[in-house]
């Protein structure tokens, strides 16, 4: 199955929390899987790497929880990101989408089954916003 696409907005210094809901059915039964959420720099180096073994990503039957702590987001360097632009992130419950200007990184969300099958579930762009406070 091809990966779905979804973009995210991440504010440096803020906790990043998202819940990804999966389509009902046997493919959503991933509680026993392992997973990773990796945000990549333009040179393919990792800006953020979360795994089910370390922390930051939790797989459930039917949904995935992602959390990047404020300490981790505060340590993100945008020095290797050359692209900037506007990111639009969908909102829940038919609300208007969110948008922000920032540096553009990319990410992949992958899971691995108990039999070793690796599947990329989501890919997209992460808009990294340095500060929303004018100083």
Regions inferred by a protein language model and the residue ranges of each:
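N-terminal assembly/attachment segments of tailed bacteriophage virion structural proteins
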Residues: 1-135
């Amino acid at each position: 199955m091809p990966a779905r696409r979804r973009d995210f907005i991440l504010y440096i210094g803020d906790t990043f929390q998202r819940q990804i809901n999966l389509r009902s059915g046997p493919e959503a039964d991933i509680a026993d899987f392992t997973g990773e959420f990796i945000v990549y720099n333009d040179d393919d180096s990792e800006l953020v790497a979360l795994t089910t073994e370390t922390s930051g990503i939790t797989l459930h039957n039917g949904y995935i929880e992602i959390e990047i702590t404020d300490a981790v987001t505060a340590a993100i360097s945008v020095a290797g990101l050359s692209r900037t632009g506007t990111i639009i992130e969908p909102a829940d419950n038919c609300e208007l989408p969110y948008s922000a200007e920032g540096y553009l990184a990319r990410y992949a969300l992958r899971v691995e089954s108990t039999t070793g099958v690796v599947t990329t579930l989501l890919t997209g762009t992460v808009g990294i916003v340095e500060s929303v406070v004018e100083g």
